[in-house]
Amino acid sequence: KRILFTGGGSAGHVVPNLALMQELKDRYSIAYMGTDGIERRLVASFGCPYFLVNCPKFVRSFTPKNFTIPLRLIAAERSALNILKKQPPDMVFSKGGYASFPAVWAAHRLKIPVLTHESDLSPGLCTKLVARKCQYVLTSFPETAKKFRNGKCVGSPIR
């Protein structure tokens, strides 16, 4: 079985993935999809295949760059689709953050099961946007799980 991990934008989206990857590496084939950000540097030490997608960061304040985000997201999703078609995983595990968005949307379009995990009490923007594309939204807190029709509290993956 092959698992594609995704998540990034900050170390908080990557370090829990590394803990899970370490635990699962002897039983599953592991790969990672993310941007050229911190996730790429942190995952490099793990030694698994890394698939790079150029995903724009969501900007919440008004800036002219916001007008380019939809087109850049489409391009990032297409890139993720091409990668997943060539090397389809059996499932995708997302830890959230803007870097995970293309992998989750592409996996959903290809009918690849997706799990996402939200560590924070208040769900992040990416989790809110992809929740309906996932089989489950796994959470660290019971009250967070209640915010999603497919929410399930499982605790937090740590090293």
Language model: regions and residue ranges:
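Short amphipathic alpha-helix
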Residues: 13-24
